[in-house]
Amino acid sequence: LPALANIFETSIDLLVGMDTIRAEETRYNIHKKAVEYQRKGDYDSAEKTYREALLIYPNKPGMILGLASTLALKGNTDEAIELMERGLPISINEKQKSTMRATLCFLYLKAGYEDKANRLASELPHTRESREVIQPLIQRGLSEIEINENIKNILLGDGKGIW
């Protein structure tokens, strides 16, 4: 491997994918540290952690949205909105996107953009599609008839709208 790394002028870590694994671990630890600060109410430290991380990972949606969430908690509404609008389109984490969209509704409202808040809220998932509704049903052990009824309810909803 060292000879191969020399030929391609790269590191052994890069050849075997360790750099990617280390980067993921590093990003995870950054989030862990920042969220710990957030939960303690130390938003300044959480903000500093994310701002420093963005110097290394400027296009990672998790870092962008992490800073946005910290700023939202601090009350820095305008910058939080800007970062969420920047981070949401590039995020592939559906849970993260859902949480950020819901938060963004309230940030829009806080900033006086009621129309934007309503428009975004109308695109959020229905309660019937949430894990709080679906997981208890799964754990209850449904009959095939009940399963089919739930599929119908999710797909057709209350019958008042298309989606």
Per-region residue spans from a language model:
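Hydrophobic micro-packing sites on short alpha-helices
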Residues: 1-16
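Alpha-helical segment of the N-proximal tetratricopeptide repeat
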Residues: 25-56, 66
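Start-of-helix register in tetratricopeptide repeats
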Residues: 28, 62, 95-99, 130-133
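Structural register within alpha-helical repeat arrays
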Residues: 33, 67, 104, 133-138
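Residue at a conserved register position within TPR or TPR-like alpha-solenoid repeats
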Residues: 37, 71, 108, 139-142
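Short coil turns that delineate tetratricopeptide repeat
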Residues: 58, 92-95, 126-129, 158-159
